[in-house]
Design a protein with these regions (language model features):
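Primarily recognizes the serine-hydrolase "nucleophile elbow" in alpha/beta-hydrolase
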Residues: 143-205, 209, 236
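N-terminal cap/lid segment of alpha/beta-hydrolase-fold proteins
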Residues: 26-62
Length: 328
């Protein structure tokens, strides 16, 4: 038996053991989404600035369909076909709510939004997208639902998507939006101090027309990057949006939202929990303006993606929508 063969065999064994123990540490489990019971269709919209976004529509049965569509907006680095999003969409359709799991220009880590007439590539996604522009995509999805006959929708923003749906409604006051759901949102402004060196780098690159260039974010446990233009967009976001619920801000953007809102977290390893929900609710209710009806819930055994608890998420949203949006 050759020395080279022994080394190769040992490497294979070590790799296998490493994969096994990594799997144990990560608590890997097989994907377990059940097939949908009702029609599902891949759909597309085009925003006013010519950015095309894809999504999937879960259509409820006609004899049980509610007069309200649900539009689910993904989180950072995600997309419309995240397995738990699909499971939630299917479960909502079973409960009579036609649901659209929708991409915005912020989907995935990186994407190509479009090409300009001059042939320039415009990038999007978590590394390159300009978050403040995804309101155009949300408006396009609401228009799509309206074209299907739904004059009222509920917007659900998951993880980073909460900020997109909240800012959209605060700025637009869209009368077609009957309610907002914040699924695992950030409550309160970031406690991480801005890095002046990183900001200076970003500003210099943007001023030089190199906003697509990537910056490496310091002090991260794994390599993390962001484009100069995206970083500038985030850093210059007004505090009324970064402290959307008014935990420390006297005039937050939520004061311009009048529809009912709901927020929830998973109880198992989500980014926050009941303490944050209580802070959100008390902060909004002390304001002189804004939504008067604020509901909160915990998704029992749910993680940040609600894996395995998709039906519970759907039931939570459906009950709230039936009580707050369809009976008033």
């Amino acid at each position: 038996m050759s020395k080279r063969y022994l080394i190769s065999l040992l490497a294979a064994i070590l790799f296998g053991l490493g994969a096994f123990f990594f799997g144990l540490r990560m608590d890997l489990r097989p994907e377990n989404q059940k097939p949908g019971k009702f029609p599902e269709q891949v759909v597309f919209v085009r925003a006013t600035d010519d950015v095309v976004s894809g999504g999937v529509m879960f259509t409820s049965p006609k004899d049980a369909s509610k007069p309200l569509a649900i539009i689910w907006v993904h989180g950072w680095g995600a997309n419309f076909y995240v397995p738990s999003y699909v499971g939630i969409g299917r479960a909502l359709a079973e409960r009579g709510f036609t649901t659209i799991s929708a991409n915005t220009r912020m989907h995935d880590i990186g994407n190509v939004e479009k090409y300009t007439l001059s042939g320039k590539r415009v990038r999007g996604g978590g590394y390159w997208g300009v978050t403040s522009e995804d309101a155009r995509d949300i408006a396009a999805w609401i228009g799509f639902a309206e074209h299907l006959g739904y004059s009222r929708v509920a917007l659900v923003g998951h993880s980073a998507g909460w900020a997109s749906v909240g800012r959209y409604q605060a700025d637009s006051k869209d009368q077609r939006v009957a309610g907002l759901v914040f699924a695992s949102p950030a409550v309160g402004p970031s406690t991480v101090a801005d890095d002046p060196h990183l900001l200076a780098q970003a500003k210099k690159l943007v001023d030089e027309g190199a906003g697509d260039d990537l910056l490496r974010l310091p002090n991260r446990s794994f390599p993390s990057f962001i484009s100069a233009a995206t970083h500038m967009d985030i850093i210059t976001t007004p505090r009324e949006y970064t402290d959307f619920f008014g935990t420390q801000t006297p005039n937050p953007a939520i004061t311009r939202v009048t529809c009912p809102i709901m927020a929830f977290f998973g109880s198992k390893g989500d980014i926050a929990g009941e303490k944050a929900l209580n802070l959100l609710k008390s902060s909004v209710q002390r304001l002189s303006q804004g939504p008067r009806r604020v509901e909160t819930a915990m998704i029992v055994n749910g993680d940040h993606e609600y894996v395995g608890e998709e039906a519970q998420v759907a039931q939570t949203i459906a009950r709230w929508a039936e009580a707050e949006l369809l009976t008033r």
